[in-house]
Amino acid sequence: VSAAIPVGTVNDYPRFGYRGFMVDVGRHYFPVSYLKQIIDMLALHNINYFHWHLTEDQGWRIEIKKYPKLTEIGSMRPRTLIDRETQTYDETPHSGFYTQEEAKEIVKYAADRFITVIPEVDLPGHMMGALVSYPELGCTGGPYEIPCKWGVFPDVLCGGNDRALQFAKDVLNEIMDIFPSPYIHIGGDECPKVRWEKCPVCQAKIRELGLKDTPKHSKENQLQTYFMSEVGKVINDRGRKMLGWDEMLEG
């Protein structure tokens, strides 16, 4: 049997420059070995950005050396909701976090496969993992508990507290020491303002900044804009670009 293959050239390239895949390890921890398997599959499918969602209400998963309680306390929860209708829990403790060296290992493993790791630290909402560890960062001062179920929770970083703002800056500086990605994701979504509306520290900051309610934006939403802008300066000063969820624009 004889056969012939026509002479030709195949030019194959992806349609989109950004081809991303997100893994949420905040709600459920995955070991490094499993993440490497995911990265191998991403490379096989020409995905070039691995969006690593590292922090959540239900758990803080990345080592921050300046704030060791984040992983000593904030990475653990006693159980997890497994059926919303019956409110059934698995009664199994869940924990786990990545050391900075493990995170760097993932960064290199991905880079060797032409994938950039984009870290996400979601703030100022979705911060119960931080508030449990450092209650002074919240409006009420706690005590707080790690949620064992899903949803949006009223306790967030205190938007008027300079210490909470410095915490966010410190965390992101360590994140940028680990991750060379040009993009740093800071969340910005699902940040209820019920605590800020009654918090004397937040209201004092609102008055200091001269923020007023407008037909489109409450003064508390504008306080979030201030908070995110200050955080963004730290990112931009290090030559990076800030990413966030669409709700960031509500301020």
Regions found by a protein language model. Give the residues of each.
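Gly/Pro-rich turn-and-neighbor structural signature
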Residues: L165, K169-G251
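Feature activates predominantly on carbohydrate-active enzymes
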Residues: V1-Y183, C199, E230
